[in-house]
């Protein structure tokens, strides 16, 4: 979903969000500068800011030196762009930071401080990808081990029956 020019309401605190233009990426990012400090990224915008080498000076300037109000992260949140209920997902396989994602339009909402925390999880995208690969390998490896163990526990008579039955 392309960035709209409409003013959005923060899904965490309901305050009107401010559009901050980030010239380096050529996009507007919606930031709750007068409420909780949350940031809403339209579909695919987040990928422009999630690594350490990507410039977020304009975002930092918009949120620095503010005393943001606390929010209840357990309450359901609705996408400020399309109104769909947002889902909580972990930002990485480390499962340390949860972000709110909209499956309808692809938007992402980060609570105050989460963008910096996500950027500090990995040095670069390659490190993130390697971590995902290790996680998947470990998960599949465990499943394969369980399958092999279950196969070994089958009695010879059961194996014969399975073979005759085409299982």
Label the predicted regions:
Residues 10-13, 32-33, 79-82, 102:
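Short cysteine-rich clusters marking metal-coordination/redox-active sites
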Residues 2-12, 16:
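General detector of N-terminal leader/presequence modules that precede the first folded domain
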Residues 39-41, 46, 108-110, 115:
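Short, structured motif recognition centered on aromatic/hydrophobic residues
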Residues 16, 35-39, 85, 105-108:
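Cys/His-rich metal-chelating microdomains
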Residues 17-21, 25-31, 87-91, 97-99:
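Short, recurring structural edge motifs at helix starts
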